[in-house]
Amino acid sequence: MRTTIRDIQQMRDRGERIPMVTAYDYTSAQIADRAGIPMILVGDSLGMVVLGHDSTVPVTLDEMIHHTRAVVRGARNALIIGDLPFLTYASPEQAVISAGRMLQEAGAQAVKLEGGVHIAPTIARLVHLGIPVMGHIGFTPQAVNQIGLRVQGRRANEARQLLEDALAVQEAGAFAIVLELVPAELAQAITERLRIPTIGIGAGAGCSGQVQVWHDLLGLYSDFVPRHARRYTDLATVIGEALTQYVHDVRTGTFPGPEHSSRMDPTELAAALGNLEES
């Protein structure tokens, strides 16, 4: 049975930490689902770790829908949240169309939007129409060209703004909020002042849950390793070694072996070849 927003809220209310990961394809979603991950984010981070862009900005809504469909097919139990990419929710009206496509065409159960006070009316509009929304404040990757890649909220005025953002997103009806690259002390203070779960990434252990990018978590992406990421394994090395062995086996003729091939009755083969030669 698929995890619901109510389930996530109850986890928060019980003090149960909430793990979330990103996934971008059917196979990864299957693996995450089997591991018991209750929420999967189809993040626009796919622009970097899957499509090879320098940021999330070039990602399109069609690309997000394509990948979200695959994740929905792969994960039967997790709550699936689809990112709305850059400039697909510039107005409440545009957000309704974009979020509607994410739910209707892709099959996501919720969408995620970046922004605080200024985006709250858009969140409220979506929630009013029955579209569940996860918020995202702090470092917002879609604004990287404007704010740069840095921790947000270290100064008192910035911290106050982030708290106002979090409260505005909550009051607009978001069911959860991502806190990215926020000082741990501030993230905990925000968490304690909200009724909804906070999901941290580079925001310390005081959040209601944590999210990590699939490729960072598993050691698949070497172009850039965020400080806040913990590599639980080094799949890039494991996969590289496997592919090197495959190349060796093909070139030396040790693959495929007899066990990897099907056989044919010699008389049938002779008859077939004989017919070919006669023709």
Curated annotation (Swiss-Prot):
Catalytic center residues: 180 (proton acceptor)
E.C. numbers: 2.1.2.11
InterPro entries: Pantoate_hydroxy_MeTrfase (IPR003700), Pyrv/PenolPyrv_kinase-like_dom (IPR015813), Pyrv_kinase-like_dom_sf (IPR040442)
Compartment(s) of residence: Cytoplasm
UniProt: Mg(2+) binding residues: 44, 83, 114
Pathway field: Cofactor biosynthesis; (R)-pantothenate biosynthesis; (R)-pantoate from 3-methyl-2-oxobutanoate: step 1/2
Pfam families the record matches: Pantoate_transf (PF02548)
Residues at which 3-methyl-2-oxobutanoate binds: 44-45, 83, 112
Catalyses which reaction(s): 3-methyl-2-oxobutanoate + (6R)-5,10-methylene-5,6,7,8-tetrahydrofolate + H2O = 2-dehydropantoate + (6S)-5,6,7,8-tetrahydrofolate
Protein name: 3-methyl-2-oxobutanoate hydroxymethyltransferase
Gene that this polypeptide is encoded by: panB
